[in-house]
Amino acid sequence: MTIAVGEALMAVGPKAAVKEIEEAVAFNMQDWGRRYPHAGYGGRFRHWIKENNPKPYGSYGNGSAMRVSAAGWLYDSIERTREVARATANVTHNHPEGIKGAEATASAIYMARNGSSKEEIKEYIEREFHYDLSRTLDNIRTYYHHVESCQETVPEAIIAFLESKDCDDAVRNAVSLGGDTDTLGAITRSIAEAFYGIPAVLI
């Protein structure tokens, strides 16, 4: 779905209206979802993919944040980045927490690629989205469990980035928490890549 969202955003261009973005994202996600129906989607999303007239279903799941990374790269202001992230979430995850998770993730990516420090990213996310980023990974590990909500995935993924030394370390941090590790890893790595760059060995 990350590819589907990125492809849709590039197709409509940087000045597209919110409605145009939402329509393109919904079309592309359905297209990719139907082509790859066994990719481990959640139950409601699987049904959404098949709908002739898909509607948002109030989800606050972490899928909205997992797929949003392109929004953090394609726009020249954090306000536009957040507007587009909100639009990509709204086609399915129109619960306030689902939208917030997508906006926070895209904002962190935008700031990371534009040279903000970890402290600046942390302060912005805490102020704008009211996530508690003061916790440590060591503390989180003592109680963390498998959970798929934005509000219990996105802050932890950002903390995994904040405590990291490089891209690979960020992913190791995320996976070390357990729980929904593929989503944690995807969110954390999307921020880490913007901050550290792509490791040379992967280029």
Go through each PLM region and give its residues.
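Structured, active/binding-site neighborhoods that engage oxygen-rich ligands
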Residues: 1-203
